[in-house]
Amino acid sequence: MSGDKKSRSVIYKKTSRDKAVSVYLGKRDYVDHIESVDPVDGVVFVDPDLLKGKKVYVTLTCAFRYGNEDIDVIGLTFRKDLFFARIQVYPPVEDVKCLTKVQERLMKKLGNNAYPFVMAFPDYLPCSVSLQPAMSDVNKACGVDFEIKAFSASNLEDRYHKKNSVRLLIRKIQYAPDQPGPTPRAETSWQFFMSDKPLHLTASLAKEVFYHGETITVAVTVTNNSEKTVKKISTSVEQTANVVLYSSDFYTKTVAFDESDEKVSPKSTYKHTFTLLPLLAYNREKREIALDGKLKHEDTNLASSTLLKEGIDRTVMGILVDYKIKVTLTVSGLLGDMTSSEVSTELPFILMHPKPDSGAKESEQEEDFVFEDFARDHLKDELQPEEKEEEEEDEK
């Protein structure tokens, strides 16, 4: 019974205000596989009568936003394009050689006025990431986003109007690697003044890759052969966001914390397993925490670790995210509790989403299309100042 039912495939659609151009995409998330990136493959449907001889172009833009775009300071906008590509879709300049199954079925369904396009990502672009603003700065966005735009114009020199264009936000994302690296483990010793033997610390994780929402356990062993007393042991998950634009800035934030007040006396050993759960839900009020890019007003999560292709410079513009476990020992000083000091070690790890089940990939059998409109209201706050002016003029 259920086997006779066709599966349903969501197609994302958006139409220009003048109804002359519509864009259809089979997905909104495009996966960076490290060695390659899924191209943006879509279809543009045109109404030649409404176009009145105009051409239709499609652009792919990666932009870094770092402020409130409503404010224009002496002609400077708070946006920098990291990548821009443009192709002419109508009239077609060249045929798309290899159509995807979704493109083939869309063109068959839409008819003769449907034209396919393919836009490729270069391998050096960052993924979709944003920094969490303060509660009072909700409109001051800072992050990397990607946009597909289609517009009609007589020629590229002419300024097109908002009503003649379609804008769709998409995401570039990564999933956890298939082959994780070695299990993180750190061993270190400290030699203190007036102590013949050192304080030894061993910390390890169960694996290198953890998924969002998964509990992280940290096994800690303290062998105290010194004359000092370890008063406290703490563990934390540290997120480091390397924001590279005009300079390279680092933002390190603690996103999970656990500690033990168990004292480790001289000439003794202590073992303990700490539990950490890095979640955005516990960090809603912390400013400048890196988050995965989001579409519309849906919820998101802490940013995933950034994986770079071998040979790619880490100074590429964007936001690069790393995670580490920090284990800190608070040790008594010469005057006891009055002059305590801290020593620590670190364990890098990867925090990402698991790769979806391969069974969720495009099926060989035909699927029913379900068309979902890109909501224009959700993008209204993303417009640049000059585009908002055009929109207001168009609505008059």
Curated annotation (Swiss-Prot):
**Keywords noted in UniProt:** Calcium, Sensory transduction, Vision
Name one matching Pfam family: Arrestin_C
Matching InterPro entries: Arrestin, Arrestin-like_C, Arrestin-like_N, Arrestin_C-like, Arrestin_CS, Arrestin_N, Ig_E-set
Its signal peptide is none
Q: Which domain of life is it from?
A: Eukaryota
Q: Which GO terms describe its cellular component?
A: photoreceptor inner segment; photoreceptor outer segment
One biological process term from GO is: visual perception
A single GO molecular function, which one? G protein-coupled receptor binding
Q: What does this protein do?
A: Arrestin is one of the major proteins of the ros (retinal rod outer segments); it binds to photoactivated-phosphorylated rhodopsin, thereby apparently preventing the transducin-mediated activation of phosphodiesterase.
**Which family would the database say this protein is a member of?**
Belongs to the arrestin family.
Q: Misc remark for this entry?
A: Arrestin binds calcium.
Q: Which PANTHER family match?
A: ARRESTIN (PTHR11792), S-ARRESTIN (PTHR11792:SF15)
Know the name of this protein? S-arrestin
